[in-house]
Amino acid sequence: MKLLHIDTSILGAGSVSRELSALIVERLTRGTQAEVTYRDLAAENLPHLTPATLPSAHPLSAMAGPLDATAQAARAASDRMLEEFIGADTVVVGAPMYNFTIPSQLKAWLDRLAVPGKTFRYGANGPEGLVGGKRVIVAVTRGGFYGRESGAVSAEHAESYLRTILAFMGITEPEFVLAEGLAAGDHNKAQALTSARAAVQQLAA
């Protein structure tokens, strides 16, 4: 199994999403010969999307014109990220919710994956995903409460966005491990961590 592990939190060792993503990877790789590729997108400081940073397979990448050494390195990095994603059997993502949505570094990574002809195509009936055979597990962490019973579900644009972009690429059944209410007091945080850790152990290995 080829497993791609992505972390995005800016909190380093204090990050709950990092803890949970690591637990998920440990759960999936225990007793296996998995090949794990790890990327810490917070540390990599991915630049936002431009024609120069698009993967070379993207039709709009030619708009960049001649690339200097810095731009060539950025494009090569984008190419590697796209191929890592396409080549992975399983993808594990740690995704904290920042200001109601995903971290900008995670968005920058996803922007490099949405490439026509590689991860989706436009067919007679609209977009068709091309990487539907992949398993994707996302550890989502939230400081507040945004579930249906909270009254704030309309402000939740992290899990909802991830479901949308993954489905666009053909991944229609992503799995989510959720820890929320982490900033709502020690009791709520402890309960959320206990529940999320238990959910990790219930994942099919």
UniProtKB/Swiss-Prot annotation:
Protein EC: 1.6.5.-, 1.7.1.17
GO molecular function: electron transfer activity; FMN binding; oxidoreductase activity, acting on NAD(P)H as acceptor; oxidoreductase activity, acting on NAD(P)H, quinone or similar compound as acceptor
Keywords, in A-Z order: Flavoprotein, FMN, NAD, Oxidoreductase
InterPro entries with a match to the protein in the record: Flavodoxin_fold, Flavoprotein-like_sf, FMN-dep_NADH:Q_OxRdtase_AzoR1, NADH:quinone_OxRdtase_FMN_depd
Residues the record lists as binding FMN: 9, 15-17, 97-100, 141-144
Note on how the cofactor is bound: Binds 1 FMN per subunit.
Catalytic activity: 2 a quinone + NADH + H(+) = 2 a 1,4-benzosemiquinone + NAD(+); N,N-dimethyl-1,4-phenylenediamine + anthranilate + 2 NAD(+) = 2-(4-dimethylaminophenyl)diazenylbenzoate + 2 NADH + 2 H(+)
Signal peptide: none
Family that this chain belongs to: Belongs to the azoreductase type 1 family.
HAMAP family: Azoreductase_type1 (MF_01216)
Protein's job: Quinone reductase that provides resistance to thiol-specific stress caused by electrophilic quinones. Also exhibits azoreductase activity. Catalyzes the reductive cleavage of the azo bond in aromatic azo compounds to the corresponding amines.
Name by which UniProt lists this protein: FMN-dependent NADH:quinone oxidoreductase
Organism of provenance: Methylobacterium nodulans (strain LMG 21967 / CNCM I-2342 / ORS 2060)
Gene: azoR
